[in-house]
Amino acid sequence: MYTLTTSGKTISIFSCAGSECPIIYLNTFSNEGQKVFEAAQAASCPPFTLVAISDLDWNHDMVPWDSPPAFKNTDPCTGGADDYLRILTEEIIPTAEKKITGVPCWRGIAGYSLAGLFALYSIYQTDLFSRVVRVAIQNFLKNPVISMVFGHPNRKISCISPHFRATVLKQPPFFTPKTKCAN
């Protein structure tokens, strides 16, 4: 693992041994990168590089618009996703990818809760990511992102990884990958 800081964010890089592995950017609330990477390895996931970003202002960095608090006695969401996306694309990604071996065969973004919302939002704002994982998007937000995901002509679902199908969905393939890594 390699750790660095940029723009007040802590970036932890868990590198793949290969030179053309996919790279996944995971925004975390409590610095869970190590646990996620270890769980993926324990589940025999194909090799990948994980870049976990922590020290986020969760209710600001992950949300595209202002919104009232989700729960009692919590802060409102203040719509800073565009600013954070600029930091991610102009600072974090170039810095992280200088630290790995080779060139990633594809780049993905993942997140849970509000970071899941950010992951979905980001694929409509930049073409840097060809894969997205969203876990438990916040239902309290009234947002246009949900309809955009299912209605946007350039962002139709093209595949679900065979490993995800087999271990999580317990279902046969419904989508076929358009691109594969060499490994």
Task: Describe these PLM feature segments.
Residues 1-22, 48:
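A domain-start/cap signature at the N-terminus of enzymes
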Residues 54, 110-112, 135-136, 163:
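Alpha/beta-hydrolase-fold catalytic nucleophile elbow
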Residues 100-112:
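Alpha/beta-hydrolase fold nucleophile elbow
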Residues 116-126:
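Short glycine-enriched nucleophile-adjacent loop
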Residues 136-183:
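The feature captures the conserved acid-bearing segment of alpha/beta-hydrolase catalytic domains
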